[in-house]
Regions:
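Beta-strand-rich binding/interaction modules
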Residues: 165-185
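C-terminal beta-strand-rich structural cap/linker in extracellular carbohydrate-active enzymes
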Residues: 186-198
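Loop/helix patches that line or flank the sugar-binding groove of alpha-linked glycan CAZymes
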Residues: 2-172
Length: 198
């Protein structure tokens, strides 16, 4: 049953998402890092099955506390953040100031959660329903795109774009943008949804 599948991109073991992405992409600016976190979190939530999130994932919580010269993060700091079960409170605490610092991300994830919890198209209860209504488009190698459609009473087009370049849709004028992590898009409405792009 789909409700027995738990999807996650961050849990209490190993690095949290922010710290993992910072380790893999150390030269990313804050905006790029934030968009990566939003993309991974949105993918996690909108997949069929149960979505699991760790506290602070939506506002870029970090466990990397620099103890080196001038507050630099040392290898020991990285190892402690990766396996923090016995680390001091300074590492495991939640910095609630990040909530307001990353309010746009919090609002974006809130909209994604609203889609997941109010639209059955993102939470089918049987594999038969998924097979009947969810269509994953074939991706081109190294495109950075995952595209799927959900066709039921409503038709949703979901595009996850990690390519770093805009993706052009044919017949885009016939689509309604429901939610996007592109800050230039105004997407305050999540009611009366017809299509969805990320």
């Amino acid at each position: 049953m789909p409700n027995q599948v738990v999807n996650y991109v961050e849990a209490h073991d190993n690095y949290n998402l922010h710290d993992l992405l910072e380790e893999f992409h150390p030269h990313d600016d804050l905006e790029t890092l934030t968009k990566r976190i939003e993309l991974a979190t949105a993918m996690n939530i909108l997949m069929q099955g149960l979505a699991f999130m760790e506290l602070g994932q939506e506002f870029s919580r970090t466990k990397l506390v620099g103890t080196g010269p001038n507050g630099q993060v040392t290898q020991a700091d990285k190892e402690r953040a990766m396996n923090s079960y016995n680390a001091p409170d300074q590492v495991n605490q939640v910095d609630w100031n990040l909530l307001s610092k990353h309010q746009d991300s919090v609002n974006f994830i809130r909209k994604i959660i609203q889609l997941k919890t109010t639209r059955k198209e993102f939470s089918y209860s049987t594999y038969e329903e998924i097979y009947q209504h969810v269509y994953v488009r074939q991706a081109q190698t190294n495109s950075g795109l995952i595209i799927f459609e959900v066709k039921d009473k409503k038709h949703y087009l979901v595009i996850f774009n990690a390519s770093g370049t805009p993706y052009r849709l044919e017949n885009a004028d016939k689509l309604k943008l429901v939610v996007s992590n592109n800050r230039s898009k105004i997407n305050t409405e999540v009611e009366n949804l017809d299509e969805l792009t990320l």
